[in-house]
Amino acid sequence: MILFRQAMGQMIPCQAETVLGDVHGNLFGRVPSPGTRPRDVYPRRRRRPAACASCHSKGTRLISDLRSIRLFKRGLTRALIVLLPFVLTLSGCMQTVDRALDAKEADGASIAGYGEIRTYVDARLDEAPRDVRNWAPTAGRNGINALMISGGGAGGAFSVGVLSAWSAAKTRPRFDVVTGVSTGALIAPYAFLGSAYDDTLLDLYTSGIAQELVRTKGVVGLFGSSLLRAGPLRQMIARFVTPAILRQVAAEHRKGRRLFILTTNLDSQRAVVWNMGAIADSGRPDALKLFQDILTASASIPGVYPAVMIKAESGGRHFEEMHSDGGSASQVLMLPQAFLASSSHLPPSKGKSVNFYVIVNNALMPEFATTPDKTLPVIMRAYSIFVKSQTQSALTALYNYTRLTGARFHVAAIDAQVPYSMFDPFNTNYMRAVYNLGYAEFVAGTLWKDKPVFR
């Protein structure tokens, strides 16, 4: 290229145009035949004056050099074509060696050194964790109070408003079990630790810092692992989930309280329930990283944020699992499906009251909007319908369970149509609006419903 620029600088315009025409023709397949003038190939060009004799030899040398460059490029291209299949094959091998080889290996996987820190939503009763003391909550004097916080992205601010108003009313219970999915996974540790962290949640969901999470990769994202960069989400979680938070979660776990987070194993297509208190109380040096990785995975919308790779082992072989948004499997983490499906295996209440509080960070009612007949709007609209129906089914299952067992059912959801755009997913005005909605409805006494209401 340097040679090209130097030579062109030494040529008069007429000769440069002739050479460029020759190069353009060769590059794009329009090569003049011997004796054919450039204007015969490119008839729209003006007649060019003949080049002067003084620069003829330089132009000839330049043409020879350019032809050599073209031959080099052609040879390099052919070499790449020959090598590409081998490169792709090697790349494929590198990507699959450290992953589960089949469903059997994936289902038998565990996190080395941690014991029973996870189970599956679809686990059979005989597959339930054997260490019951580390999983079952210890009932308090007033029975068991369980808080379940759903997914919903920016709608998580609704939960924050509810919790803030609940604390202000001084009626917020000390929850024995807290579960979180997706954005609910980010809220759950603070809801678990109590009202002292309301201001932290307020800052996280209404200050505008959530808008930093939207950093695109540009066109590259369409062919990579995600549209948005993972860095901002990971950095935010590392900033708010500190060693001090881990120690406090561990202390509450030792008191018999339980914190559960849901992720989705994309390879096995199974919803994974993580015992976050057991992880925090493990004493392992990598416990904080695993804790943060699980929260990141649960909040990572597939395709929007990259999945999180978590190290596991099965039968002595070590590999990585790909975990992503828990909301892909369920918008709300409730009881194992085996309990919900069979009344003959319901755990005894032993005379203790059980309260299920479910906060849905989304609207359950239909929301009318004219959908543009374009690819992305149609996909997004269909996805929102899927989320609604999935949540409605989960709530119906839990409600039926409470009717069989005598437990009490309480559900809160966004029941007003707040303007929202999926092209501006963490809009601060939207987050503040749903925060205020949750707060105001709690104060007004209209928040909780004793059965699912979908219209």
Features from the language model and the residues they span:
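N-terminal secretory signal peptides that target proteins for export/translocation
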Residues: M1-F4, M8-C14, D22-G75
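Residue-level signal for mature regions of secreted extracellular proteins and peptides
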Residues: A7, F86-V87
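Sec-dependent N-terminal signal peptides
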Residues: R74-P85
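C-terminal motif of bacterial Sec signal peptides marking the signal peptidase cleavage site
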Residues: T89-G92
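Patatin-like phospholipase
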Residues: M94-V177, F192-R455
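Gly/Ala-rich beta-loop-alpha elbow adjacent to hydrolase catalytic centers
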Residues: T179-G184
